[in-house]
Amino acid sequence: MNSETLPAELPATLTIASRESRLAMWQAEHVRDALRKLYPACDVKILGMTTRGDQILDRTLSKVGGKGLFVKELESALADGRADLAVHSLKDVPMALPEGFALAAVMSREDPRDAFVSNDYASLDALPAGAVVGTSSLRREAMLRARHPRLDVRPLRGNLDTRLAKLDRGDYAAIILAAAGLKRLGLAARIRALLDVDDSLPAAGQGALGIEIAARRADVAAWLAPLHDHASALAVEAERAVSRALGGSCEVPLAAHAVWRGGELHLTGSVSTTDGARVLAAHAHARAATAADALALGRRVSDALERQGARAIVDALVAASAQAQKGGA
């Protein structure tokens, strides 16, 4: 490679940290290919890593430490220089990044909706009473319990291929997955129905890819700038602001979804109890040109949820989760 052909300040090699699941590697390869197209003289590599979240498969995330389990090892690689950037599904990234790290880019968003997947049934309504439905999140569990109390909702862990394998061997009559992951892996044919956001409000950031860097690496942020999608980033920022303000994590069935309509960003947020017996929702819209605008919109929705009693729900669930983790230690 002729270093003289590289843009000024661009290194000969860029390294992307990624989890090693098939979906995570697809996402990392997607970013790698985009960077190679932008900077053909730069050698862009992927550093595959196994995170603690990938290793713990017998318990739900809410019982073992939450979303941070999927990113800590990748952040360690950023901190010590083994990697220049890390690629994440934004719904799996904690709402507040640790000190010293920054979200440098949000790429154009894929479908944020949840997908109904089954080999024998066309929709949730078609399932018989008592049918076993698998889900990996408290948010989806609460939705199912609220809207379909006749179903038997059970935890579902593992990567995407593992979850589909559990369905195929008959452990579940149906499972609920993020549509984005299925589409990215060419598995859209497995989707029997897409759940309308009014019926299953997505998790904050669902369907979006985020690129994390060490905050000190302004050089990397500059190289990633062409990959940043401003409209997607503002929508995700508003969603994450709702969750951040309420202390959202894997312990809480909290959802937030923003969509552009008529030049305005429309944001809906929801908090519920895990049994689905109580569901709170709030909506607001505004013209949002900057991250500050998106944050303000998110705060309006979180404030509205707090006025309805969301704080008490969140605090009770977080306390219960902490007690469960302490008991299982």
UniProtKB/Swiss-Prot annotation:
It catalyses: 4 porphobilinogen + H2O = hydroxymethylbilane + 4 NH4(+). One of its GO terms (molecular function) is hydroxymethylbilane synthase activity. One of its GO terms (biological process) is protoporphyrinogen IX biosynthetic process. Pathway: Porphyrin-containing compound metabolism; protoporphyrin-IX biosynthesis; coproporphyrinogen-III from 5-aminolevulinate: step 2/4. The keyword Transferase applies. The modification S-(dipyrrolylmethanemethyl)cysteine is found at C250. Binds 1 dipyrromethane group covalently. It is an enzyme of class 2 (transferase). Keywords: Porphyrin biosynthesis, Transferase. GO terms for cellular component: cytoplasm. Its EC number is 2.5.1.61. Its cofactor is dipyrromethane. Monomer. The porphobilinogen subunits are added to the dipyrromethane group. Tetrapolymerization of the monopyrrole PBG into the hydroxymethylbilane pre-uroporphyrinogen in several discrete steps. Belongs to the HMBS family. This is Porphobilinogen deaminase. It comes from Burkholderia mallei (strain ATCC 23344). The lineage of its organism: Bacteria, Pseudomonadati, Pseudomonadota, Betaproteobacteria, Burkholderiales.
